[in-house]
């Protein structure tokens, strides 16, 4: 039997690391196959991987941000591959630079249509933003876990801001409980 939290799917994981080394981006873009660097458009090198599918943004300070991975394991694998590719170029990077998950974006569903006007009133205006003329979703901010949930009339939702996948599951359980208590779910 499937549960509500089974509808949650990770769409994107963003993580950062510090390579502990300042980098010459012009040279890096030349030496690193497939790297893109256009300082007029973006101040870092963009290095894409096909497996795991991701893009790592590498800055001259040695900071790097990996985005596009679809699991926490994938983001760790992607950063490890990038670090190895940089080491292969002779760049001295300490062993196992720490990886910090900054944001996990998940999608999910409450499996029913929602009355967003009633939800906005029921949840209270202090934690809710709902302006359907500007955006079709209701923005609901939770404190624990510290995430933002976008609710749509279709019952679909997006949960962002978590640092581990359990945050999304917990958020969905809280939302389901609150909406049920308000009599807004069937």
Curated annotation (Swiss-Prot):
Gene Ontology molecular function terms on file: DNA binding; DNA-binding transcription factor activity; general transcription initiation factor activity
Top-level taxon of the source organism: Archaea
Sorted UniProt keywords: DNA-binding, Plasmid, Repeat, Transcription, Transcription regulation
Residues in Sequence repeats: 10-86, 101-179
The UniProt record lists the keyword Transmembrane helix: no
Gene3D superfamilies: TATA-Binding Protein
Gene Ontology annotations of biological process type: DNA-templated transcription initiation
Keyword match Protein biosynthesis: no
Residues spanning the signal sequence: none
Family classification: Belongs to the TBP family.
Function: General factor that plays a role in the activation of archaeal genes transcribed by RNA polymerase. Binds specifically to the TATA box promoter element which lies close to the position of transcription initiation.
Protein name as it appears in the record: TATA-box-binding protein D
Name of the gene encoding the protein in the UniProt record: tbpD
């Amino acid at each position: 039997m499937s549960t509500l939290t089974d509808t949650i799917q990770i769409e994107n994981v963003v993580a950062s690391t510090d390579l502990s080394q300042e980098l010459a981006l012009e040279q890096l873009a030349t030496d690193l196959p497939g790297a893109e660097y256009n300082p007029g458009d973006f101040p870092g090198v963009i290095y894409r991987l096909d497996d795991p599918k991701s893009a790592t943004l590498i800055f001259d300070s040695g900071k790097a941000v990996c985005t596009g991975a679809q699991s926490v394991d994938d983001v760790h694998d992607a950063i490890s591959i990038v670090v190895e590719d940089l080491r292969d170029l002779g760049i001295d990077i300490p062993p196992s630079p720490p990886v910090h998950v900054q944001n996990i974006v998940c999608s999910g569903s409450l499996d029913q249509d929602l009355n967003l006007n009633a939800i906005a009133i029921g949840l209270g205006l202090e934690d809710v933003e709902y302006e359907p003329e500007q955006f079709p979703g209701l923005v609901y901010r939770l404190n624990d876990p510290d995430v933002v949930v976008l609710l749509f009339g279709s019952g679909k939702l997006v949960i962002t801001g978590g640092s581990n996948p359990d945050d999304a599951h917990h958020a969905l359980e809280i939302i389901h409980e609150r909406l049920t208590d308000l009599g807004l779910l069937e």
